[in-house]
Structure formats: structure tokens, C-alpha cells
Curated annotation (Swiss-Prot):
Annotated organism of origin: Leuconostoc mesenteroides subsp. mesenteroides (strain ATCC 8293 / DSM 20343 / BCRC 11652 / CCM 1803 / JCM 6124 / NCDO 523 / NBRC 100496 / NCIMB 8023 / NCTC 12954 / NRRL B-1118 / 37Y)
Superkingdom of this protein's organism: Bacteria
Record-level GO BP terms: mismatch repair
SUPFAM superfamilies, A to Z: DNA repair protein MutS, domain I, DNA repair protein MutS, domain II, DNA repair protein MutS, domain III, P-loop containing nucleoside triphosphate hydrolases
HAMAP family membership: MutS
Gene: mutS
Protein name: DNA mismatch repair protein MutS
SMART domains: MUTSac, MUTSd
Amino acid sequence: MAKVAETPMMVQYHEIKSQYPDAFVFYRLGDFYELFEDDAVLGAKLLELTLTARNKNSENPVPMAGIPHHAAQNYIDILVDQGHKVAIVEQMEDPATAKGMVKRDVVQLITPGTKLNSGMGNDKQNNYLAAVLPRDNRYFLSYIDLSTGELKTTTLKRFSDVIDELSSLEVKEIVLLKDDETTELGIANKLAERGLVISTQSDVNVNATVSFLTQPLVHENEAQVTTILLNYIFDTQRRNLDHIIPAQNYERLAYLKFNQDTRTNLDLVKNARTKKKAGSLLGLIDETKTAMGGRLLKQWLLRPLRDTEDINERLDVIEAFQNEFFVRGALQDHLKSVYDLERLAARAAMGTMNARELVQLKRSLSAIPGMKSVLSSSQGILNHASQRLEDMSDLAGLIDEAIVDDPPISIREGDIINDGFDSKIDEYRNVLSQNQKWLAQLESDERAATGINSLKVKYNKNFGFFIEVSRANVSKLEEGRYERKQTLTNAERFVTPELKEHERLINEAQLKRTEREYELFITIRERVKANISRLQKLARQVAQLDVLASLADVADNNRFVRPTFTDDNIINIKQGRHPVVEAILEAGEFVANDVNLDQNTAMQLITGPNMAGKSTYMRELALIVILGQMGSFVPAESAVLPIFDQIFTRIGANDDMAMGQSTFMVEMAEANLALQEASAHSLILFDELGRGTATYDGMALAQAIIEYLDAHVHAKTLFSTHYHELTALADKHENIKNVHVGAVEDESGELHFLHQIQQGPADKSYGIHVAALAGLPDELIANATTILSGLENQEALVPEPKASGLSEQVALFNVSDVDPKTETLFQKLDSINISTMTPLEALNVLAELQKLRK
């Protein structure tokens, strides 16, 4: 865009903009933030602002759009939520006293990963910023929630692990080091393809603060990636960040591992269809009362434990809460009064906490003595929890003594400090409180002296104090004593020496009062800041109690039981239930099922009609495992479980078409991940693997995968299939057992699903019945029934296994005995691509198949 001859202000703007080319520059001009040039054009569109121009009459006017400074935060949030960055440029000196161009500078760069919440809401969502560093054929990851101070780091083997971890954390912005290795690996492009905002850091400095925050880290590359992240934060935030907690390393091996596909397949934190929390497992189990508790619950759900002792510690507290119903209820009543302590502490550290947030902090801290009292009335573990909670009544008392209960949002306009807290403020307030009395007396005296009964003493922001008389009475005023200040249509306004002096005293008292109140507010906020570590420790303890009490609520409300963990590698679940599906159905409608895989059973082959409940059965096992290992009770009458290290799933058809992958490719990729990564301590759930390709290929691959898992992996596996021929594998492999989902036909031929898992294979799949239930045309159903009858009358396609041939394989196919007509029919079936076929095309194909049969 062509530019006009630049004014000093625009020179200053362009210098700043050149440093932040990828950000919207909010340039402070008086009471407004201005956007210029391309920022103004795009900003006006995104924010629905009026687009104007600077130097409108010039050949090249400069586009501009303005935002009132008091409303800027709303507009900033809109831009950042859309993935943009915003550089805030403030006036660094008073324009009234500045010589020449007012100095301005960027005071903060707000990005998707550094956006802060106010701390006054009930936000149960973390906002993580991460850095990734590739070194030595591994990936080092560090992430931080700037709004809470949480800082963690880990080492990952593969880039796919990085993607899974970033997805689990719901990271929006990634910081990368500008170096050759990062560039050569194309990491920026790979991450950008997934919708992440990419930021880069060139300089990496290790100052005293960085050294302190990375000191706990042993691995050099973990310290380096954390240093990159911290440098980016310090460069963009330009403020005190004393709330950041020294970095903690974590090992993924310490937690039950599962990838994004599994999280999606199981609806763990969001419903796969609606993308909302409602309808997910998290939505069901979140009965937390605080924002910190909500965030911690989600972290526990996404990182179930593998240490039995740690799991049982959580279960012990839940059980104690179950046994102490009234204690739990009273505790939760107190928790409802607790605001977001983590984020309030962070805002105090960063110097952004206002007076209202101080009051929120006071109310939160004031709830702690009640919580301690309630817990101490119990015995054992809850009593011990009471002793760990720190009573911070000293800080709450200071805030209560100093700050009014309902302060204004602004901290610079006074009315924040309580009467009686400070003698100077009381003195100034006394002067101000006498103002109205003094003005009333002046008005009375002036009326008596002038004889003008309509004379009034008034005040407004533009002219201050003045005496107003009607124009008809101006002649009654004593000459030389009254100084004209303003002429109106029907009146004149004057000031007197006494009124001028009074205004000076009032303004001085007002100014000194607000300055003194601000000074005291900052002092109190600094006292809060000095207690950051105490507040953060207290916040963690309160969050844990909130989560455990919430899980006790969930257990009571949903008939969950405490699981038992064993080293015997068995799964023994009595009347297990899918908690989310059960919650949707009417009471008593959900059909519970046992899940039994003993030491001699590694795999269940599950057959039965579509819609009968195979997928639900598989999902409920995974959810019970995850709930149990996160330290929660589980939906069953009883549950004995091993400790799993990983869960692999292929359930549903969440095709990655956007990444150019078909259903079958996704199936094979997910199967390969399990084959390569699973151990004997893993859980594998494969739902109808092989359906995405031709029948023979799919069946052959399914059998090969089953036998590979049995021979080499030995993981506990649920494998559902519509290939009924595969059920013969149970006769060959002792660790494979057949089960099926029951269904019965009534006398009229109508199909009824029992939703019960029964021993042995299903006798048939009832696919045509399911098609009829789906509403396919009667003519089509009749044709399909005829075709099926004809196929079933043909010679068996899968004879009994023979000793000859594939000595270690179950012979699924013996096509040498198939007559030519049937072979032609098979070839035609193999050529059909049902995923792209329209209903009309399906009818035509069925008609053609019927002709081939005749």
C-alpha cells in the first residue's frame, strides 16, 4: 500500500509495526487504540468497526479504525480467539508534559498461548503455550499455562507423540527455535497444517530467573526447550512473572497412554459428534465446584496413573467422602465460595489484579477455616487433609480491613479503601464530605448578599464550580468581585475568589485521596504477591479435595463401585456399564454386561448384528479402565482389573479424509500402531477391522492381525468382526474366546436386540434385518433376502480346517470347488465400492446380482 509523506507519529508507528509484522498493533492515541493501514482494513472486517482514514483528502489516505481503550479487551479477545496476535502500544509519558513526539512502546504481546483470563470466572479450561525442540532423534516438549504458572516438560520419541501430547493439552500456539534442524524437519509446516499458531524465538538467554525455573531439570535438552519457552514469554509479556512454578519433568510412561483417536473414539472430554463437553465422559463426571478443580479433573482423566499405590490413595479419599455424606456436602458448600485461586494469584504476581479480584481472593480465603473445621470433624484421611490446608486468615483479614466490599473496577479513581483504614484518606474524605455543606452555605450567603433568590452554586466536569444567575439579574452582582466564566442563552456563570480557592482545595483533596488510595492498593497487592507460593499450594490442595469430593458425588449418583487392581493379568467386571450411554437412557433401560478375560484369555472375538451393542461393550471396558486408573470408582457391580500401560482403539469410522487418508488406510495405520507399540500390559479394541477393503482382503488381514496379536503381543484384546468365518480361530488358539451380542427373532420375523454378551459365536449377522430397521425400501430388502438365500444354498465357502495346506492357519477360503457362476458373482461383489454408491445404484447392482444367480 502506498504511503503518504510520513508524519513523526506514522514514522513511530511503522518502526513499531516492523518489529511485530504478524500482529495487530493497537496504537494508543489519547482515549483510543488506533489500527492503521492493513491492520485497520482487516480489523474493521473482523471486529465490525467503522473504517475511516487519516488525511482523507490526500492522494493516499491512511486507513484507520479506532477502539475505545476501556472496551479494548473485548476486541483483543475476539482477535486472539481467531488465532491472531495483538501488540499493545501505550503512551510512555504524559502527552501534556511531553516535549515533541510522545514516547510509545509495546507493553505486551497477546497471543493465543499467552491470553490471560480474569480469574473471576469459573473457567475450567487451561490455556497452554508450548515449545518443541528436535534433538538427537527425539523431541523435547515444554508447556506452560501463563494464567496459572504451571510449567512442565517431557521427552518424546516420535513426532506423532508430539502431536498427541499437543492435542491432549489443546495447545493453540507453538514456539520453535529458529535453527537448521527445526527447519529441515519441516516442523513448522506440519504443526501449522493442524491449525496451530507458530511463533519463533531467535535469542535464547539464560538469566537468573530462567536458571531458577529450569534448575530442577536434569536433561540438558529439556532445560533448553524450557528456556526457549521462557524467553518467548518474557519477551512478549514484559512484566513480572513471579507466579511461574519451577519446571517439572514428567514421564509419559508413568501414565496410561492413549492417542487422540482413542480420546475421540471414547468421547473422553468432548462428544465426537457435537464437539461439546456435554455427552462426554468428562461432562458426566465433572461435579467440581471450583475452576481449579475442573481443570485438575480433566488432567487426571487424560493422564490416568499406572502406580497402584497412587491410585488407591485417591480411591481411599473418595471412599472416605462416600462414608461421610454430610461432611462432603458441607465441604462442597464452602467450595462454592472459592474463586479461581490459581489465576487470582497469577494476576497479583503480574500486577494486573484489581480491587474486585482482591475481594474475590478474600472471600475464597475466608472459606478455608470452614473447610478445615468440616474436615477435622471427621476421622482418618479427611482429618489429615484438614491439617494440610493452610489457614490464610492473615491475608484475608488484611484485605477485609482495607478494601470495601463492592469496589469499582478501576483502581485509579478511588472509593477502594475502607473508612478508618488510613488517617490521611479519612482526612481527605472529611474535606470532600464537607463540600456540599460548604456549597449550600455559600449559595445561601450569596443570595442574601445579592438579593437574587434564584442564584445557584453548581459544578460540572468542564467548568468546575461556578455561580449561575439569570441574565435579568446580572446587574445586581457587585462589580469587580464576580469573574464571568460562561455565557448562556438565559444565564451567566461566574466565579469568585472564594469559590476558586474552594475548588483548588477540593481538587487537591480529591487528587491526594485517589493517589493515596492507589498507593495503598498497590501495597496490599504486593502483600498478596509476597504470598504467591502459599496461595498456589493452597489452590492445589483445594483443587484435589474438590475433584475427589466430586468423584464421590458421581459414584453415589451413578452407582459406581471401587475397583480392585491385581497383578494376575485378569479382567473380571460384573455388570459393567457404559456410563455416558446409561445417563442418556431412561432409568433401567441400559443392559449391563460382564467382562471376563482370565489369565488364559487374551482375546475375545465378538460377533453379532450391527446396532446390537458390540461397540458399546468395547467402549465401556475402555472407560472403566480409564476411570479406574485415574483413581475413580467405576460403573459396575464389581471390577477386578490389571494395570494397563496403553490403550489402542479402532472404533467407528473417523476417516482422515482431510489428510488424504481413506477408511482402510486409517484402519491399517491404527492397527499397525497397536502391533508395533502394544505390550502384554496393553488393551486393544478393534471394531470390525478390515471392512474398508474387498471381502477376501479384509478377512485375510483380519485373521493375520488376530494371529499376530496372539503370537507376539499377548495384549488383552476385544476384536469385533462381521466375518463369522473368523470364529473358527478360537478352535485353533487357546487364548482366543468367542462371544456374541445376543439377538432373537419373534414369530413375525422381527429382530429384537438383547444387548447381552453371550458365550460362543453368533449364528448369523442379521444384516438384512438391520437394513430394514434403517428404513431401506421393501423391494430392496426382498431382493437382498432372495440373494442371501441363494448364496446360503451354495456349497460352503469355508470348510472345516484341514491338516494340509497352511499348517498354522485356519483355511478361510477354498475357492477351487466354487462353480464358475458363483465365481463370477464373487468377482462382481469384489468390484463394488459401497462407500461411494447411491441408493439407486445399489438397487441396480442388486438386480444385476440377481440375474447372475439365475
